Amino acid sequence: MTITLTENKRKSMEKLSIDGVISALAFDQRGALKRMMAQHQTKEPTVEQIEELKSLVSEELTPFASSILLDPEYGLPASRVRSEEAGLLLAYEKTGYDATTTSRLPDCLDVWSAKRIKEAGAEAVKFLLYYDIDGDQDVNEQKKAYIERIGSECRAEDIPFYLEILTYDEKIADNASPEFAKVKAHKVNEAMKVFSKERFGVDVLKVEVPVNMKFVEGFADGEILFTKEEAAQAFRDQEASTDLPYIYLSAGVSAKLFQDTLVFAAESGAKFNGVLCGRATWAGSVKVYIEEGPQAAREWLRTEGFKNIDELNKVLDKTASPWTEKM
């Protein structure tokens, strides 16, 4: 099935990609970034620090990315110093979720809308949804209705809608556990099937790889839960679960593991259309920024940060498929 795009959405998608491949830098982290910064200083990270670090990353690394994903809370200064060639996605969700309940309900930023995100110069709206396909069905209906609203907003504004799905299990506390690893492919691939339906108005899915590679033979240091063939099957099932373009998130893994995973995904038959890669690219700059200041962080981004993004781009050249084949 080929999906048709409006003229405006197509132009926006082209601005966000290079030759149909989305090699985007993700820096819409808020809660996670504050926690990373807090590891290296005793005082609470300030707004100025967060804005400055985001701006440094944007300025130094967007010349090598097709686009950057930022948040409207701390990322607007960073959006203004990005490379002229780079597209912009803005996050529409509040950071984090209520940990006192298993429902992880979505919530939009109070003073933002798809219209305002477009007015801020973004080529796309990104929204993050936590989803457990086997979870409370009333909760899931609420989530589906929420995504329908955002899809309708994006249609009305004629702006691409990137839906990020982070899966979980209401009964498993730790997503890094072997217990979750065993159900991850089911969680990821079934959620993709749901939100690929036309009613949700999603243009691109931003998703997890369907396997925790740390438990795959040849990748695992410890316990092996999956053979390479079983892992490859999970990627093939993922490819079959949607007609939409989909891109991978790096989920905080190391740059090397993420790159190796992309090669494995492509060899397995996943026709993914790029990445939105965050911490795997810039994580090391946080400590340097706090301990040695902005100039040292800039230097780190120009060397280590550049190396990470350059290596990732080379891997993408060999592994990613253009979204234009699907739309």
Curated annotation (Swiss-Prot):
Per its UniProt entry, what is the enzyme's top EC class, as one word?
lyase
Q: Which SUPFAM superfamilies match?
A: Aldolase
Pathway assigned to this chain's UniProt record = Carbohydrate metabolism; D-tagatose 6-phosphate degradation; D-glyceraldehyde 3-phosphate and glycerone phosphate from D-tagatose 6-phosphate: step 2/2
E.C. code: 4.1.2.40
Q: What are the BP-aspect GO terms?
A: 6-sulfoquinovose(1-) catabolic process; D-tagatose 6-phosphate catabolic process; lactose catabolic process via tagatose-6-phosphate
Query: Keyword annotations for this protein?
Result: Lactose metabolism, Lyase
What is the reaction catalyzed?
D-tagatofuranose 1,6-bisphosphate = D-glyceraldehyde 3-phosphate + dihydroxyacetone phosphate
Gene3D superfamilies in the cross-refs: Aldolase class I
Q: Please give one Gene Ontology molecular function term for this protein.
A: tagatose-bisphosphate aldolase activity
InterPro entries, A to Z: Aldolase_TIM, DeoC/FbaB/LacD_aldolase, LacD_aldolase, Tag_1.6-dipho_adolase
The residue range of the signal peptide is none
Q: Which PANTHER family match?
A: SULFOFRUCTOSEPHOSPHATE ALDOLASE (PTHR39340:SF1)
Family of the protein in this entry: Belongs to the aldolase LacD family.
Q: What is this protein called?
A: Tagatose 1,6-diphosphate aldolase 2
